[in-house]
């Protein structure tokens, strides 16, 4: 390798560093100033890049934040599947408790809420929000409930898509409306109530 080649910057590595800095900045800033006051200029300043760098990769602050949340949800060490210990009720409680903790963490809650609110007024963003952030989780719950059916712990005729909505709907409603704390006790109560409805018929 020549001296010239050795000193040539690795453009792809540098671009990825800039990308990660931008995504981190968007997550941090939305928690500090809120989504309405979040700007591309502020993200660029925090990330140490020019705003044109951001506009080359993303058309809007919502697009930046969507990528940031997607990366956080699918990054290293993230397992999108639900545990299967053989006890579907215990497994659902474990996961919903962890979800309650995550949704109570300001570092996660602020950007995710910002996207949820923005998506309510933007059909294209809503579709991407559903496909990239919600559907993988919903599918994981569906797979775990299907395994519960196969194990005889859940009614074999249960509509699994509807069952997941019944389980998660009250949780999401409480979070979105800030109508109560997302405690482990609340998560357990939801699972217990749902499992009574999901149980095999005598």
Predicted ranges, named:
Residues 63-72:
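Alpha-helical DNA-contacting segments of helix-turn-helix folds
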Residues 1-9, 90, 94, 135, ...:
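C-terminal peripheral helix-coil segments that are non-catalytic and often amphipathic
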Residues 57-58, 129, 168, 172-173:
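Tryptophan-centric aromatic hotspots in well-structured domains and transmembrane helices
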